[in-house]
């Protein structure tokens, strides 16, 4: 079985493409079934395995398969599933085989490949991806072992380095950008759309600035109400957004909607009602919640996750020593995992050897039992049994030695000496 990771992320693709390749949570299980069965070869000697990790910054397919053409098949499947031409998608896709796939998984879970260096949210997202793959019946021995090692490495990296300390989160970056637009965030009205982990982080950071008002709008009213109350804010129905948008100076949105929830027309009306006072908008969702055309309006300052990434990277340089430590830990653990993977490759061979040897044993025992039943001398029967087993067990190695020549034969001889520890060397004339 070969490990393979196929994907795109914030390093290789803009948000405009990432949002088209993202998988809504409810689509992942059925997608895994088609991906595993159609493109990883259901007739393969070993059952193929697959997992999908889809976040705002990356979409990745983790595979374990015998199919040597899995790389091309995975890219083609991703293209067809999302109805994106292969020629448009392929230049942004990375394909990581074997140790590269292992190293990548370890780095992703440890926060080394994130836009926010050392962030912890990705680890929870990977665990969710594994849980979903397990429920879909798409996870097996290889990927299960990979992810368990991945989580252990992430824990080790975060526990022994300072990779996650003083990191600038997306939420903190949003506040910093708001401070560039408005002299005092404390004088502004803030609207947060959504009620997930990212919006919760934004609520924490914006509430710390003491805004004039903090309001949460969410599709599920009860959840939005609970979040608003935690930060002494108010909740409002998401349906009221088009008619009340003009009330807010700062709008941050991050929902799981597959389509934009804030359109150009609604923002145009809000700007007009505000008499062209500026609106600061942050779209942290992938796919995007706010139509990109909104950013072209004169009095609107619209930022996406990619825009916030530049601010986040400013805080990453100071933690390069921790990065070096983390990379060293990861490299050691990659080698450990590859050793385990190598041992797995010989398991079928060992199993076959046991099966063959046992078949020989049973055949000879059955023959011996028949001889004993007809009254043959037990000592002679046992001698014949042992001779037959000896001849048949060494037949394979002997035939192999006779078939090869030159350096191959010398290598095989050395290998056989390892099997039979007491085999005499060719220059040993002692006769022992």
Curated annotation (Swiss-Prot):
It is an enzyme of class 1 (oxidoreductase). Pathway: Porphyrin-containing compound metabolism; protoporphyrin-IX biosynthesis; 5-aminolevulinate from L-glutamyl-tRNA(Glu): step 1/2. One of its GO terms (molecular function) is NADP binding. SUPFAM superfamilies: Glutamyl tRNA-reductase catalytic, N-terminal domain (SSF69742), Glutamyl tRNA-reductase dimerization domain (SSF69075), NAD(P)-binding Rossmann-fold domains (SSF51735). InterPro entries: 4pyrrol_synth_GluRdtase (IPR000343), 4pyrrol_synth_GluRdtase_dimer (IPR015896), 4pyrrol_synth_GluRdtase_N (IPR015895), GluRdtase_CS (IPR018214), GluRdtase_dimer_dom_sf (IPR036453), GluRdtase_N_sf (IPR036343), NAD(P)-bd_dom_sf (IPR036291), Shikm_DH/Glu-tRNA_Rdtase (IPR006151). Keywords: NADP, Oxidoreductase, Porphyrin biosynthesis. Possesses an unusual extended V-shaped dimeric structure with each monomer consisting of three distinct domains arranged along a curved 'spinal' alpha-helix. The N-terminal catalytic domain specifically recognizes the glutamate moiety of the substrate. The second domain is the NADPH-binding domain, and the third C-terminal domain is responsible for dimerization. The keyword Secreted does not apply. It catalyses: (S)-4-amino-5-oxopentanoate + tRNA(Glu) + NADP(+) = L-glutamyl-tRNA(Glu) + NADPH + H(+). Its EC number is 1.2.1.70. This is Glutamyl-tRNA reductase. During catalysis, the active site Cys acts as a nucleophile attacking the alpha-carbonyl group of tRNA-bound glutamate with the formation of a thioester intermediate between enzyme and glutamate, and the concomitant release of tRNA(Glu). The thioester intermediate is finally reduced by direct hydride transfer from NADPH, to form the product GSA. Belongs to the glutamyl-tRNA reductase family. NCBIfam families: hemA (TIGR01035). Pfam families: GlutR_dimer (PF00745), GlutR_N (PF05201), Shikimate_DH (PF01488). GO terms for biological process: protoporphyrinogen IX biosynthetic process from glutamate. Homodimer. Substrate binds at residues 55-58, 114, 119-121, 125. The keyword Transmembrane does not apply. The record marks 104 as: Important for activity. Gene3D superfamilies: Glutamyl-tRNA reductase, N-terminal domain, NAD(P)-binding Rossmann-like Domain. NADP(+) binds at residues 194-199.
